[in-house]
């Protein structure tokens, strides 16, 4: 069992993240099931920014589901498409983008995100992630004989990359998405004013 007891403070703003959030882009990173899409939509409403979800953008452009892309092109093909979408969205302004859980696997993606806006890592425990994803058949990486163990492996692999990329780390497990988004919006607004 992976211990997730030692977690970051609820909101930890580093450096000029608040300034970037007030005028620029906000990118949400984290594991599948962390709440990126739900919190991102709410945060976009509170901060009056346009919301995008990279997985949905890929689906809109290809006309097929993520599992179908994995089946036809493999994970490598999907990751290539993900990088293309991220690269295009880096030209946008005043957006909130929920990235796919594996977006941080690419060093190119990590650099684009880190330098293109404020990166918020929505972190949740393995138990919370499992509870949110265990019945979702649209998660190709969890279609294994032991999906919970696979989720734990992905967490161990990706957590350091999320932390490396993020300007802000937020525990998303125990608060409602609305409360979390309100708290983030307030903190980002305060940080941009006191910068």
UniProtKB/Swiss-Prot annotation:
Its cofactor is Mg(2+). It is found in: Cytoplasm. GO terms for cellular component: cytosol. Gene3D superfamilies: P-loop containing nucleotide triphosphate hydrolases. InterPro entries: P-loop_NTPase, Shikimate/glucono_kinase, Shikimate_kinase/TSH1, Shikimate_kinase_CS. ATP binds at residues 33-38, 139, 175. The keyword ATP-binding applies. Binds 1 Mg(2+) ion per subunit. GO terms for molecular function: ATP binding; magnesium ion binding; shikimate kinase activity. Pathway: Metabolic intermediate biosynthesis; chorismate biosynthesis; chorismate from D-erythrose 4-phosphate and phosphoenolpyruvate: step 5/7. The keyword DNA damage does not apply. PROSITE patterns: SHIKIMATE_KINASE. Keywords: Amino-acid biosynthesis, Aromatic amino acid biosynthesis, ATP-binding, Cytoplasm, Kinase, Magnesium, Metal-binding, Nucleotide-binding, Transferase. Mg(2+) binds at residue 37. It is an enzyme of class 2 (transferase). Its EC number is 2.7.1.71. Belongs to the shikimate kinase family. Monomer. This is Shikimate kinase. It comes from Nitrosospira multiformis (strain ATCC 25196 / NCIMB 11849 / C 71).
């Amino acid at each position: 069992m992976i211990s997730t007891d030692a977690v970051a403070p609820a909101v930890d703003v580093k450096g000029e993240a608040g300034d970037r959030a007030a005028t620029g882009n906000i990118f949400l990173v984290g594991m599948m099931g962390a709440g990126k899409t739900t919190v991102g939509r709410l945060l976009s409403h509170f901060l009056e920014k346009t919301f995008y979800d990279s997985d949905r953008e890929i689906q809109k452009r290809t006309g097929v589901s993520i599992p179908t892309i994995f089946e036809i092109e493999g994970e490598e093909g999907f990751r290539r498409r993900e990088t293309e979408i991220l690269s295009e969205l880096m030209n946008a302004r005043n957006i909130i983008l929920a990235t796919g859980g594996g977006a941080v696997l690419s060093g190119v993606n990590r650099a684009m995100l880190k330098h293109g806006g404020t990166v918020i890592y929505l972190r949740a425990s393995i138990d919370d992630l499992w509870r949110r994803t265990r019945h979702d058949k649209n998660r190709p990486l969890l279609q294994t004989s032991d999906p919970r163990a696979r989720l734990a492996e992905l967490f161990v692999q990706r957590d350091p990359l999320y932390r490396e990329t993020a300007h802000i780390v937020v525990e998303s497990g125990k608060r409602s998405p609305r409360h979390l988004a309100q708290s983030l919006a307030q903190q980002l607004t305060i940080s941009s004013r006191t910068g």
